[in-house]
Amino acid sequence: MKLIKHICLQLILCLLALIAQQSIFAQAYNAEAFLPPPSGPYKIGTKEIYLTDSSRHEKYSWSKKYRKMSVKIWYPSDYTPELGYDCYMATYSTKIIFDIFKPLGVKKSFLDSTRHFKTHSVCNAPLSTKQDKFPVIIFSSGYYFGIPDLNSCIMENLASNGYIVCSLTHPYEQPYVAFPDGKKIYLKKGRTRLAFLQLLIADWVRPKDKSTVEKREAITRNTLKRLKKFDKALKLWVDDSEFFVKTLIDNCAKNDTFFCKIDTSRIGALGHSFGGAVAGQLCKNDPRVKAGINIDCFQFGNVIDNPLTSPFMLIESSTYIDWNIGNEIIYSKSNADFYKLSILNSSHFIFSDASVIPFSNPKNVTDFNGKANGRKTINATNNFVLHFFDYYLNHDSKSKKLLEDKFSNSEMIFDYKLKQ
């Protein structure tokens, strides 16, 4: 009898141990990155820097203080895994993210759960010593919704392939930025929403007849004239970006231990949503920026009358058909190599981490990504972004060959027009 009790006790203990072990494995799995594994040979480090432009006063402040900004940087590293990976969205409270994305039906409890996931990056890991210099990409995310970490998929992939990627935060017109002195700047919701109101009015009064190129161009020009709020924001963000380019060059000249590793002869511009329009205008304004990519934004600004002279790529969703038509008019005037990747049946946020975030509600997947496959889309986006910059910044002949293959299928269309 005692033997039977002993055996039963051992079985119970084994069962409890197995359950505990499964629980530990589950917790470990939940802490793993949902972000796709970066494709490059480098490990990834992150750091944040804070800058003040003493040549410009802050337009959103009555106190005439100088314009301040923060920059999150992803970069190639040779760290060891023991350093521990960054948590996803670690510097943003759930409340801030929820307040911005609540209209899209995302639950606060779900946002809380994403914070247990890890990225593939390590905060303040040492910069890689495997190259003397690395090319740099200047990135901006979206107006109103823009959070640098929400584009970690693209940032990490570029950094793992030897790029230093600098994501600028534009205070007052993006959700949140905190400075080392304790100052916190939040989105000016009322003022920023006026830009969207102008957009709604422009859509409402837009002529419906788009039957000819001339009519489509007239519609595009009329839309650009009506979007004054976005034009003002574009100038502010481009000024931020040009100030950052100057900062990079100045710090390189001072032999800063981090910035002296940046090759300022190989600068690219990249942006998602409104940041994509910033990339286009920055390429036009600043000859130090050698190539750029607009991910899913209408090209605000004066590019329509001042065609691009730098290689450029447009990656577009199916969300804003009129924007796509307008971009076709604007970029058709380009005086440099131009590429376009169209993702069919997709929504605007499919180019962000929303493409792979493990949403618990299937409706969220459709709202953010459309009907397109999120993981396949972000992988394709990463592939084209990388090959584009590899060719135009690193002069890699293999990437050139990959960019020469036009294709069209039920999911994507890739086309280009090369300068003769």
Listing of model-derived features with the role each one plays in the protein:
Residues 290-351:
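The feature captures the conserved acid-bearing segment of alpha/beta-hydrolase catalytic domains
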Residues 179-261:
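Alpha/beta-hydrolase active-site loop
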Residues 78-96, 172-177, 339-358:
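Short, solvent-exposed beta-strand-terminating loops
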Residues 27-137, 370-371:
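Domain-level recognition of soluble alpha/beta enzyme cores
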Residues 1-28:
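Bacterial Sec-dependent N-terminal signal peptides
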Residues 28-36, 41, 45-46, 54-55, ...:
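Alpha/beta-hydrolase-fold serine-hydrolase catalytic core, especially in secreted/extracellular enzymes
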Residues 243-307:
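Primarily recognizes the serine-hydrolase "nucleophile elbow" in alpha/beta-hydrolase
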Residues 120-134, 139-178, 320-322:
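Short substrate-entry loop that stabilizes the transition state in hydrolases
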